[in-house]
Amino acid sequence: MKLFAVSDIHGATKPIERATPLIRASDLVVIAGDITHTKTRAEAAEVIACIEQFSGRILAVHGNWDKIEVKDLLEEKGYSLHGKGRMMGEIGFFGLGGSSPTPIKTATTYTEEEIALVLQA
């Protein structure tokens, strides 16, 4: 299986467009968070739509820079791996979005206890 893995997009669609040949050649796009810069659902939808032009097979988690509404968008589209596992062929993908607390204020952080609850679910 050929993967196109990306993280820390922060709303920038130009690099995605430049990677079109790689995305089209992949079997699956994996987004490992920080989809937005402005943290909004609208910006996340724009980034996801850009990727969807080139691939319909996407798995993703929201990042600590993304608001919960971005997680909700990924879930609505069936792309979210937050607290879930999904098999793609013989390969398992498992995810946890956001982050543990950081020195800087970010949109989505989880305490160690919250992380443990998600991972145990």
What are these regions (language model features)?
Residues 66-121:
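Conserved catalytic scaffold of divalent metal-dependent phosphoesterases
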Residues 1-4:
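Extreme N-terminal starter segment of soluble prokaryotic enzymes
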